[in-house]
């Protein structure tokens, strides 16, 4: 007898899933969550530069000025610029006598 005839080969029925409760709502919910997580992770990796650039610059725009008169907008811009200028003056070198 050769070795090839002695080797046990699995039949198709042994390869199939033996889970009888695959229609369990918890299993279905876990599968859906897993698939959604995988899709979101792939999209995040593909478009991460666009996504995070939008959040980084989009959140720094400041409050909306829609419906605000132009004079008040200009006053707000001046206040913001003076706050930036005051912050820059913090790093002025001091000369001692």
From Swiss-Prot:
Site keyed Seems to be involved in pH gating: positions: 41
Segments traversing the membrane: 23-43
Segments of this protein annotated with the region Disordered: 59-88
GO cellular component annotations of the record: host cell plasma membrane; membrane; virion membrane
Key word Ion transport present: yes
Positions in the Virion surface compartment: 1-22
InterPro entries documented for this protein: Flu_M2 (IPR002089)
Record keywords: Disulfide bond, Glycoprotein, Host cell membrane, Host membrane, Host-virus interaction, Hydrogen ion transport, Inhibition of host autophagy by virus, Ion channel, Ion transport, Lipoprotein, Membrane, Palmitate, Phosphoprotein, Signal-anchor, Transmembrane, Transmembrane helix, Transport, Viral ion channel, Virion
Primary location group: virion
Described purpose of this protein according to its UniProt entry: Forms a proton-selective ion channel that is necessary for the efficient release of the viral genome during virus entry. After attaching to the cell surface, the virion enters the cell by endocytosis. Acidification of the endosome triggers M2 ion channel activity.
Family to which this protein belongs: Belongs to the influenza viruses matrix protein M2 family.
Remarks, miscellaneous: When the channel is activated, one or more imidazole moieties of His-37 probably become bi-protonated.
Protein name: Matrix protein 2
Protein species of origin: Influenza A virus (strain A/Beijing/39/1975 H3N2)
């Amino acid at each position: 007898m050769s070795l090839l005839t002695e080797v046990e080969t699995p039949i198709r029925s042994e390869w199939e899933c033996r889970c009888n409760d695959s229609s369990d709502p918890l299993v279905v919910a876990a599968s859906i969550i897993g698939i959604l997580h995988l899709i979101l992770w792939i999209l995040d990796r593909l478009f991460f530069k666009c996504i995070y650039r939008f959040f980084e610059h989009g959140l720094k725009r400041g409050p909306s000025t829609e419906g605000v008169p132009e004079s008040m907008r200009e006053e707000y811009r001046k206040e913001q610029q003076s706050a930036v200028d005051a912050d820059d003056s913090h790093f002025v070198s001091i000369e001692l006598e």
